[in-house]
Curated annotation (Swiss-Prot):
It is found in: Cell inner membrane. This is Zinc import ATP-binding protein ZnuC. Residues 273-298 are annotated as: Disordered. InterPro entries: AAA+_ATPase, ABC_transporter-like_ATP-bd, ABC_transporter-like_CS, Metal_Ion_Import_ABC, P-loop_NTPase. One of its GO terms (biological process) is response to zinc ion. Part of the ABC transporter complex ZnuABC involved in zinc import. Responsible for energy coupling to the transport system. Transmembrane segments: none annotated. GO terms for cellular component: plasma membrane. It is a peripheral membrane protein. It catalyses: Zn(2+)(out) + ATP(in) + H2O(in) = Zn(2+)(in) + ADP(in) + phosphate(in) + H(+)(in). Signal peptide: none annotated. It comes from Brucella suis biovar 1 (strain 1330). The gene is znuC.
Length: 298
């Protein structure tokens, strides 16, 4: 996926959220401390770290869900935030359609619902019950719900949790495309080390505090990163920097970089404008897998 510079040379920085020396203290210990980060319009910033490193805590501070016990958190005035939590308290066994999920936090015009579902590639699932969605489809529905309110920034807490490998690649590709299409900022947290690296502009590595930060290449070459994740976490980065000019949508269509779509050629994994070969040794950003007798599912 092509990355866009968040602030080209000479352009004023448009900071949406900023944390300075922020920390949260609970039950006699610091959950996370000394966090410095900012997210600008059009920028993807990713929090990585092992379980318990403070990623969700830092994200909740950024959202003003948690008040910092030290330091400060500031938002741009009038900031609109779209939030996709790590866990959502919805009983998916109860009747709940995708379009109804979209309006749980408040009414939305029909055209906004339709546009958001189309943007994330699941317009064909508007009437579907959430209980029947795959993990990737449900995550897309949650992203659509956040996107429909036209946020300045999207905060995504472990957005690929419970999604298999090809689904993870597809969701990271989608996140980058939504950033490119809307110009919003993105703050996401992930325990993934490689797929996410190809989808982000800046990385903040947490382990109770900020271990290191910078571009993906800066972070993966940092001694602190290697100490935390081991040298095995460095080598495969380049594998995920191989990209195509297309994305496969869950409804079977092919979306190209110029915004056009096409139906795939029968018996092929690509449309008429390009080629995909899984045997070439690269991991591809396909957004579906095939199931017997059903729609492709992300």
């Amino acid at each position: 996926m092509d990355k866009k510079s968040s602030h080209p040379a000479g352009a004023a920085r448009d900071i949406l959220i900023e944390l300075r020396n922020a920390g949260v203290y609970r039950d006699g210990r610091w959950l996370v401390r000394n966090v410095d980060l900012s997210v600008e319009r059009g920028e993807i910033v990713t929090l990585i770290g092992p379980n318990g490193a403070g990623k969700s805590t830092a994200a909740k501070m950024a959202l003003h869900i948690l008040k910092p016990d030290e330091g400060m958190v500031s938002h741009k005035p009038g900031l609109r935030i779209g939030y996709v939590p790590q866990k959502i308290n919805i009983d998916r066994t109860l009747p709940l359609s995708v379009e109804r999920l979209m309006t749980l936090t408040g009414p939305l015009p029909r055209k906004e619902i339709d546009a958001a579902l189309e943007a994330v590639g699941i317009a064909h699932l508007a009437k579907a019950e959430t209980a029947h969605l795959s993990g990737g489809e449900f995550q897309r529905a949650l992203m659509a719900r956040a996107l429909a309110r036209k946020p300045d920034i999207m905060v995504l807490d472990e957005p690929v949790q419970g999604v298999d490998f090809s689904g993870e690649a597809a969701l990271y590709e989608l996140i980058a495309r939504l950033r490119d299409d809307t110009g919003c900022g993105v703050l996401l947290s992930s325990h993934d080390l490689h797929l996410v690296m190809a989808a982000t502009d800046r990385v903040i590595c947490l382990n109770g505090h900020v271990c290191c930060s910078g571009t993906p290449r800066d972070v993966t070459s940092s001694p602190e990163y290697v100490r935390l994740f081991g040298s095995r976490a460095v080598g495969p980065l380049a594998v995920y920097e191989h990209h195509h000019d297309h994305t496969h949508l869950p409804d079977g269509r092919v979306l190209y970089a110029d915004g056009t779509t096409a139906d795939p050629i029968a018996g092929s994994t690509m449309g008429p404008r390009g080629h995909c070969h899984v045997e070439d040794g690269h991991h591809h950003d396909h957004e579906h897998h095939h199931h017997e007798g059903g729609q492709p599912r992300a």
